[in-house]
């Protein structure tokens, strides 16, 4: 608050190396005293700076350097370059490297262990085998959206939207590819993704590429802490409108049931973060008739509820 600058010494006594060329700094969501810093050149790796809550006093700082990890199969991972780091809602740290992506689960005590996890994608061909997620892809950027999905930008293959399936500490944990955007199927000016930023309140994803900046309006926003601000738009829905109806202001893991004026179930939706989208059709794919519809919102536990009305005019 006094407007003064303070410097941090990234010299670590244990490894006897000097660390420089810092990448984008990530403040750990578990403890803001922990700062994760990718080192882009010379002694490439991750630096963990622990400032003990006193950033103006370097005497009580602790700096540790990490450049080798052991995956779930006891295989060492020593990336030649680290480009990106992000942390999801469950405090898992995702690291993008020159040869793929790996995770440091929140269950790992990184001060005592160098364990990590590489996500396996099943081949689903009857062999029981799988492949590592984005193996040998250079990962330039990682961002987490309001539904806790990963947006992963690569050096040559565009951007992937990945949805976690299961608990990361379980052997069956995997990722499903929700979308894969390239110059062939989108307006992206280049398949070289350099940076990603997400406005979580709106779901807009900004993608910096080798050919310029683009944005994409996703269907996931930051979840609300309660249902006090639930609403739907557009509302009313006019006959000429053919797009999605958005129900926003919902809590995490919300199920939205669309009911007609008679209380009959028309459609069941699953929220993504703070948003659920409805195409205005029933469970059989038919556009619903004119009328007032109720969006009944319930959390997974059923302890909290919210409601909003939608007027359909056909």
Question: Regions from the language model: what does each represent?
Answer:
Residues 191-227:
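Blade-level signature of beta-propeller repeat domains, shared across WD40, Kelch, NHL, RCC1
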Residues 271-303:
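Short, surface-exposed loop/turn motifs with a glycine/proline- and acidic-biased composition
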Residues 11-30, 68-89, 122-146, 180-199, ...:
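Short coil-to-beta transitions that initiate beta-strands within beta-rich domains
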Residues 30, 38-42, 98, 106, ...:
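Short loop/turn segments immediately following the C-termini of beta-strands
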């Amino acid at each position: 608050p006094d407007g003064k600058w303070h410097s941090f010494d990234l010299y670590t006594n244990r490894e006897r190396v000097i660390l420089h060329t810092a990448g984008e700094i990530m403040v750990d969501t578990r403890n803001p005293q922990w700062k994760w810093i990718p080192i882009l050149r010379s002694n490439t790796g991750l630096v963990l700076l622990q400032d003990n809550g006193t950033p103006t006093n370097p005497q009580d700082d602790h700096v540790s350097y990490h450049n080798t990890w052991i995956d779930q199969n006891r295989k060492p991972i020593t990336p030649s370059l680290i480009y990106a780091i992000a942390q999801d809602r469950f405090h898992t740290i995702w690291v993008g490297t020159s040869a793929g992506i790996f995770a440091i689960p929140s269950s790992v005590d990184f001060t005592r262990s160098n364990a990590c996890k590489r996500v396996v994608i099943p081949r689903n061909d009857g062999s029981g085998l799988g492949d590592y997620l984005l193996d040998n892809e250079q990962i330039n950027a990682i961002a987490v959206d309001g539904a806790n999905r990963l947006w992963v930008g690569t050096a040559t293959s565009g951007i992937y939207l990945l949805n976690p399936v299961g608990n990361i500490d379980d052997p069956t944990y995997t990722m499903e590819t929700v979308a894969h955007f390239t110059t062939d199927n989108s307006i992206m000016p280049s398949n070289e993704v350099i940076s990603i930023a997400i406005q979580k309140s709106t779901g807009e994803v900004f993608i910096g590429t080798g050919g310029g900046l683009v944005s994409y309006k996703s269907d996931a926003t930051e979840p609300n802490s309660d249902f006090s601000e639930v609403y739907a738009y557009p509302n009313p829905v006019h006959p000429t409108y053919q797009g999605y109806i958005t129900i926003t202001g919902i809590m995490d893991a919300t199920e939205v049931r669309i009911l007609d004026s008679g209380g009959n179930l028309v459609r069941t939706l699953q929220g993504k973060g703070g948003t659920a989208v409805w195409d205005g059709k029933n469970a059989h794919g038919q556009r619903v008739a004119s009328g007032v519809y109720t969006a009944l919102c319930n959390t997974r536990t059923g302890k909290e509820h919210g409601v909003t009305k939608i007027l359909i005019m056909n």
